[in-house]
Swiss-Prot record:
Main function: Inhibits coagulant activity in human plasma, possibly by interfering with one step of hemostasis (modulation of platelet aggregation, or coagulation cascade, for example). Does not show fibrinogen-clotting activity and does not inhibit ADP-induced platelet aggregation. Also does not show hemorrhagic activity in mice.
Keyword entries, A-Z: Hemostasis impairing toxin, Secreted, Toxin
Keyword Signal listed: no
GO cellular component, one term: extracellular region
Tissue: Expressed by the venom gland.
Official protein name in the record: Snaclec uracolectin
Family: Belongs to the snaclec family.
Localization per record: Secreted
Major subcellular location class: secreted
GO molecular function term, any single one: toxin activity
Length: 12
């Protein structure tokens, strides 16, 4: 389950 707008970053 990823937030809408997830791409290649993490912990932003």
């Amino acid at each position: 389950d990823l937030p809408s707008g997830w791409s290649s970053y993490e912990g932003h």
